[in-house]
Structure formats: C-alpha cells, structure tokens
Amino acid sequence: CHTISNWKTTAGLFHIVSEKAVVRNLTIDASCSMKCTDNGEEEFYAGFIADVNHGTLEGCINRGQISHRSGKSLMSNYVGGICGMNKYIVINCDNYGNVSSSGNFGGNLDNRSAGIYLGGVVGGSPTRPLSCAFIGYCDNHGTITYSGAFPNNYIGGIAGSHTYVKVKFCTNRGNVTVAAKSISESDVPQGLQVGGI
C-alpha cells in the first residue's frame, strides 16, 4: 500500500489512467485536499486518484476533501472522490472525504446538454454503451453536497451518473444534499436526478 499525505492540489494524481493501466492500493489521506474550478469552455473532470479512468482502479481509498466550483461553465463537469469520469473498471475503492460542488451554468438557455455529475466514488460515465465498464464493491462514507444552477444535475453517493456501466455490491453511507436552482427566473432545472447509489 502507498499513502499520499499533505497534498494540496487542483487536479487528480493522474489526469488520465490509460487503457490496460492499473492503479492499485493507493490511499489519499485526510491531510490532502483538492480545490478546483473549470475553465468554462471544455468538459471538466476531477477525481483524487484520476480525473479520467480508461484502465483499472483497484483498492484505492480517498479521505481528502474535494471542493469544486463551476465558473460560469459552458460544458459538463464530472467530479468524484476517486475519479471524475470512469470508462472502465473501479473496484474495491472507498471514499471517506466530503465532495462538494457549486456554481452556475454560463451558456445560452438553448444549450440544454450541459450538466453537473457529482459522486462520492465516480462523477459520471460516457453516455454511450461501454461493454466492460464496471463499478463494484465500492463504498462512500463522505458527504456529497451540491448547490448551483445547471440544466442537468446528477448527484449520487456512489456515482452521479452510471449510464451503460454495471454497478454491483456498492454501498453509500454518506449524506447527499442538493440545492439545485433554476438557471433563469422563468426556468427550472431540466434534469435533476439524486440517489444514494
């Protein structure tokens, strides 16, 4: 096992974990913290172990706090305790750190595809079929908090969104708190999905 301590960061340890790569038995301890803000013009990914995972994350633990803010974003944001975007396997990974996100959508009201994807373990997954993508035997113990105004809001204890991903034997033990706002006085959030898993 390897432990990282006293680390203050604005991005994950690995920006991208590539195909066939394995990150195993790595712990981010409670002395670590992440504060991150998207650049507004591109999709944004953040997770303590990996921002984007194409490989395997196994036996990893996060105890650090993540604080994300969207600065008038035009695109979607994916934030998770272990990884922001998962495209392959996350197994036996636990999150104990609090994960929070706030901020507002900065695009035209006609652009309804942008969203916040916030989860204790994984932020989200691609919205197209992935035959092997899997989240299994993972637990979240941290508090997940979201406050903001986006067309779409997906918040979960394990994953904000896991479309086309198999999720098995996962448990959420943390609180999930959401205060989604309308993006204009005459509008309401188009999509609001909140769950323990």
Q: What are these model-derived regions, one by one?
A:
Residues 1, 6-197:
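Surface-exposed loop/turn motifs in large extracellular/passenger domains
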